[in-house]
Curated annotation (Swiss-Prot):
Organismal lineage: Eukaryota, Viridiplantae, Streptophyta, Embryophyta, Tracheophyta
Domain of life assignment: Eukaryota
Membrane-topology descriptor: Multi-pass membrane protein
Bilayer-spanning residue ranges: 21-36, 101-115, 140-156, 203-218, 237-252, 457-472
UniProt record, GO biological process: photosynthetic electron transport in photosystem II
InterPro entries according to UniProt: PS_antenna-like (IPR000932), PS_II_antenna-like_sf (IPR036001), PSII_PsbB (IPR017486)
Subunit and interaction comment: PSII is composed of 1 copy each of membrane proteins PsbA, PsbB, PsbC, PsbD, PsbE, PsbF, PsbH, PsbI, PsbJ, PsbK, PsbL, PsbM, PsbT, PsbX, PsbY, PsbZ, Psb30/Ycf12, at least 3 peripheral proteins of the oxygen-evolving complex and a large number of cofactors. It forms dimeric complexes.
Cofactor note: Binds multiple chlorophylls. PSII binds additional chlorophylls, carotenoids and specific lipids.
Any one Gene Ontology cellular component term annotated for this protein: chloroplast thylakoid membrane
Major subcellular site: plastid
Gene source species: Arabis hirsuta
Pfam family, one: PSII
GO molecular function: chlorophyll binding; electron transporter, transferring electrons within the cyclic electron transport pathway of photosynthesis activity
SUPFAM superfamilies: Photosystem II antenna protein-like
Protein name: Photosystem II CP47 reaction center protein
Length: 508
């Protein structure tokens, strides 16, 4: 046939049987990848420390998606929250992976069957005997079925009526677990961080889809609309389908990057905005202040801060710190977190408490500056010693740790104080194991960053695909040079533009 690579899909343009076949094969490839990727991740995943080495630090991509839908147990005898289990049941991580692979195999066989048996009666128009698809009717069927699936997910799976529920956590990602969710029918259901909105929106959208599907099954489109939107052309279907996909990709890129109830930080890691706004730092200080108000000592108040909360307040977990083209998990970057060293409190020789100014997201290096409670600079690590006025040595800065492994330990040696001041720029201080994975010390992004980048990139690509195929289907007659209303019998090749006698070719 000699088709160029970018036109090979035209072979299924007027062949409904094989058009169906290639779509089934595509589904087989997607399901097969999902199942295989899940098995690979399970083979390399270490579930032993869900606090300091969670799935998102290890670069897991499909495990978080299974977990948010209610899968928490493994046939390996472990639970995602760190416990051990004896009866994981069929729908474990491995069970879901296996189901995808079996489904992929069945789709593969179905695709081959439909490729071989492409000339089925169901695809024939009984009036003409030629292959033909009733596209508005097919649209109605698909809309109805997707509406049923959408409604069923919201009404049964999410609510726990028939299913496990979904992953729900507190605003600081500390108490997450799978639980049933009641639909939120009030205005709170529009808050992207309210899990109840997931149930209510699926129920509402599913109901709308069912009704719209029934409408399109029972009502034929007007002839002018049918012709105007080229509803008989399969490329119209391609164009509008691409539009639906790129729109969805843009939406999920946003919900992933900015955060929502559908992308819990326990499964995908924190967002960059939580670092930018000092979200976890404020909560830590609030808890410490509450502890001090209850007459706890400073050491006791800091010791009650959950290690999980402290770990979120560390710049190495910020998805915007990893370069887009740095391959590997966060653990391959700064290392595997082993333990919290505690919160460093710096003081000058007058006893005034000093705070290290934190590194903004998009800086690789940042000057070490210590300010007091009023934001006035009191100490720093100078670039040029000859002009320094606030150096750690001159100001006499000391550091004392509260909570964590160094609780109660203090240092006055300037070199040690400067070391911890530099590390305090990056948030709470953790001991990191860089030997096990030969980590290079360069920050990596989390699956939150990869997902966003991938979906935003493909959404942009698919947006152009929608414009391209939409233009092709709407202006097909212009591009082909054939007037769709042309009734006269014309000879191909006689004119430069088909049927236009003013463009008669010159005899050679």
């Amino acid at each position: 046939m000699g088709l160029p690579w970018y036109r090979v899909h035209t072979v299924v343009l007027n062949d409904p049987g094989r058009l169906l076949s290639v779509h089934i094969m595509h589904t087989a490839l997607v399901a097969g990848w999902a199942g295989s990727m899940a098995l690979y991740e399970l083979a390399v995943f270490d579930p032993s420390d869900p606090v300091l080495d969670p799935m998102w630090r290890q670069g897991m991509f499909v495990i978080p998606f299974m977990t948010r839908l209610g899968i928490t147990n493994s046939w390996g005898g472990w639970n995602i929250t760190g416990g051990t289990i004896t009866n994981p049941g069929l729908w474990s991580y491995e069970g879901v992976a296996g189901a995808h692979i079996v489904f992929s195999g069945l789709c593969f066989l179905a695709a081959i069957w439909h490729w071989v048996y492409w000339d089925l009666e169901i695809f024939c128009d009984e009036r003409t005997g030629k292959p033909s698809l009733d596209l508005p009717k097919i649209f109605g069927i698909h809309l109805f079925l997707s509406g049923v699936a959408c409604f069923g997910f919201g009404a049964f799976h999410v609510t726990g009526l028939y299913g496990p529920g979904i992953w729900v956590s507190d605003p600081y990602g500390l108490t997450g677990k799978v639980q049933p969710v009641n639909p939120a029918w009030g205005v709170e259901g529009f808050d992207p961080f309210v899990p109840g909105g997931i149930a209510s929106h699926h129920i509402a959208a599913g109901t709308l889809g069912i009704l719209a599907g029934l409408f399109h099954l029972s009502v034929r489109p007007p002839q002018r609309l049918y012709k105007g939107l080229r509803m008989g052309n399969i490329e119209t279907v391609l164009s509008s389908s691409i539009a639906a996909v790129f729109f969805a990709a843009f939406v999920v890129a946003g919900t992933m990057w900015y955060g929502s109830a559908t992308t819990p930080i326990e499964l995908f890691g924190p967002t960059r905005y939580q670092w930018d706004q000092g979200y976890f730092q404020q909560e830590i200080y609030r808890r410490v202040s509450a502890g001090l108000a209850e007459n706890q000592s400073v050491s006791e108040a800091w010791s009650k801060i959950p290690e999980k909360l402290a770990f979120y307040d560390y710049i190495g977990n910020n998805p915007a710190k990893g370069g887009l083209f740095r391959a590997g998990s966060m653990d391959n970057g700064d290392g595997i977190a082993v333990g919290w060293l505690g919160h460093p409190v710096f003081r000058n020789k007058e006893g005034r408490e000093l705070f290290v100014r934190r590194m903004p997201t998009f800086f690789e290096t940042f000057p070490v500056v210590l300010v007091d409670g009023d934001g006035i600079v009191r100490a720093d690590v100078p670039f040029r010693r000859a002009e320094s006025k606030y150096s750690v040595e001159q100001v006499g800065v000391t550091v004392e740790f509260y909570g964590g492994e160094l609780n109660g330990v203090s240092y006055s040696d300037p070199a040690t104080v400067k070391k911890y001041a530099r590390r305090a720029q990056l948030g709470e201080i953790f001991e990191l194991d860089r030997a096990t994975l030969k980590s290079d010390g360069v920050f990596r992004s989390s699956p939150r960053g990869w997902f966003t980048f991938g979906h935003a990139s493909f959404a942009l690509l698919f947006f152009f695909g929608h414009i391209w195929h939409g233009a092709r289907t709407l202006f097909r007659d212009v591009f082909a040079g054939i007037d769709p209303d042309l009734d006269a019998q014309v000879e191909f090749g006689a004119f430069q533009k088909l049927g236009d006698p003013t463009t008669k070719r010159q005899a050679v």
